[in-house]
Regions:
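N-terminal cationic leader/targeting segments used for protein routing and processing
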Residues: 4-7
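Catalytic cores of nucleotide-sugar-dependent glycosyltransferases that transfer UDP/GDP/TDP-activated
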Residues: 9-500
Length: 500
């Protein structure tokens, strides 16, 4: 240990000596509402392969499947102070695929109908953030890094500085640093300022424009951005975009201020869970047997109630049905698209107006449109493997996983150039044969339609199309590279020269 600029720093020379406490509000397969759960279920596995001692902590929701609850071991219990009130929390643990998971149990806060959207979410996740810190000496784990994710864990960094680093357990917390990952800047956890002393127990010296204050409210995500050692997002382009007014969701100012400590690390996908050679799809295939992909298409057309024709381009959409996903562009163009020689299959749920749009189209264009207003993991894999193209016209997309899954199964993405979509989809060049998809730059329905038309034109040339499908399947978006980047980031936070 040395002292650098009056700051004590532990040197961790190898990944194998690094210890990380990964705090998250959801993780697959225990609880999932979006891509955050996929990251939390996959990234720790990849980091442990590098020898990093990473452990995950999350709430013990009542919705966790019973098969996992039955395998959990009870460690013990203790209490958290929420100003004047003491709240019980139990500690359960379970090792899943080589990763230790710890679950914070409290019936008052986590036995609810759903994970989020409760009237007392601010209090619930204040409790969780305090538990993330309080539980460490109880389980005997002293990490170098606490890796926080999204607003639900945003208070950890400021609470660590305000109450724990120098004041608790005889220096136990003194050399712990925090990293904050923004998975989606739109969701920030904004609550009344009265929570400062009534629930959180923070002094008002933290309530200022460079701290937790946000238009006279408290902003949990901003707290994480302001007080963490490093801030990351899930793609390089998104890291640049959120420093602008258009994408910054009113936090662009503090993000520009923290720009030296802000970086983008692209998400990966679990190649074991998403493998076209597994029996989860109709007919397993690989980059060496692309012709078998056509068999998946025909069987998908039959299951989805579409006209069976292997020559008709089939476009898939798997998405939360919300405005962020560019569905208003599809709303403007869906009739024109379906009047073309193509088919469309949609899987997802969300806002009623978008569900109604797709259901209307299914009735108006029978045999050409299949609307499945739900989430179904098995059907999702069949769509990824059976479609020719995959449409993602997002208004903004921090990383996006759909296009990565699609390319894994040889389905060519059609995307808007934003966030992770821009970083992962290489525009197709008809002259060189390079590229992995079709893109458009502006948020415009006619540009989206033009990208679809360009894709359909190339689709008619079977040799060119096989080339672009091969390009897609040869891409590597596994977690290996991302895990090494995170490992290097952890070392940077601890003051270590980054390995190449």
């Amino acid at each position: 240990m040395i002292n650098r600029n009056n700051r004590s720093v532990y040197f961790v020379w190898r990944f194998s000596e690094m210890k990380v406490w990964f705090a998250v509000s959801e993780a697959a397969p225990f609880a999932k509402t979006g891509g955050l759960a996929d990251v939390a279920g996959s990234l720790p596995k990849a980091l442990r392969k590098h020898g990093i001692d990473i452990r995950v902590v999350m709430p013990k929701y009542s919705q966790i499947p019973q098969q996992y609850i039955n395998k959990m071991s009870f460690i013990g219990y203790t209490y958290v102070n929420l100003t004047w009130r003491r709240e019980y929390y139990g500690i359960f643990t379970l090792e899943h695929e080589g990763v230790p998971f710890y679950f914070i149990d409290n019936e008052r806060y986590f036995n609810r109908d759903w994970y989020y959207g409760q009237v007392d979410d601010g209090e619930r996740f204040t409790f969780f953030c305090k538990s993330v810190l309080e539980v460490l000496p109880v389980i005997g784990f002293r990490p170098y890094i606490i890796h926080c994710n999204d607003w639900q864990t945003g208070l950890v960094s400021v609470l660590l500085d305000a109450h724990y680093r120098y004041y608790r357990n005889k220096g136990f917390y003194q050399y712990i640093h925090t990293v904050m990952t923004i998975h989606n800047l739109k969701y920030q956890g904004i609550f009344p300022k009265e929570m400062m002393d009534e629930i959180i127990g923070l002094g008002w010296e933290y309530f200022h424009p460079d701290g937790v204050e946000f238009y006279n409210c408290i902003n949990f995500l901003k707290a994480g951005i302001a007080y963490s050692a490093k801030v990351t997002t899930v793609s390089r382009t998104y890291a640049e975009e959120i420093k602008t007014g258009f994408y910054g969701e009113n936090l662009d100012g503090i993000l520009r201020k923290r720009s030296r400590d802000l970086c983008g690390i692209l998400n990966g996908i679990d190649y074991g869970e998403n493998d076209p050679l597994t029996p989860n799809i109709y007919v397993p295939f690989s980059v060496n047997s692309i012709e078998d992909k056509q068999k998946n298409k025909v069987l998908l057309q039959k299951e989805a109630g579409l006209d069976v024709n292997p020559e008709t381009p089939l476009i898939g959409i798997i998405s939360r049905l919300v405005a962020q996903k560019g569905l208003d562009l599809i709303d403007r163009m869906i009739a024109e698209l379906l009047e073309m020689d193509l088919q469309l299959i949609v899987l997802g749920a969300g806002e009623k107006r978008y569900e109604d749009m797709f259901l209307w189209a299914q009735g108006a264009f029978r045999g050409k449109m299949s609307a499945n207003m739900r989430y179904d993991h098995v059907l999702a894999q069949r769509i990824y493997s059976g479609c020719d193209m995959f449409l993602m016209p997002s208004l903004f997309e921090p990383c996006g996983l759909g296009q990565l899954y699609a390319m894994r199964y040889g389905t060519v993405p059609i995307v808007r150039e934003t966030g992770g979509l821009k970083d992962t989809v290489i525009p197709y060049n008809e002259y060189t044969g390079e590229g992995t998809g079709f893109t458009f730059a502006n948020y415009n329905a006619h540009e989206m339609k033009d990208a679809v038309i360009r894709a359909m034109r190339v689709y008619k040339d079977k040799e060119k199309w096989r080339g672009i499908v091969t390009n897609c399947m040869q891409q590597d978006f596994s977690w290996e590279r991302s895990a090494r980047e995170y490992g290097n980031l952890y070392n940077q936070v601890c003051g270590i020269t980054v390995t190449k």
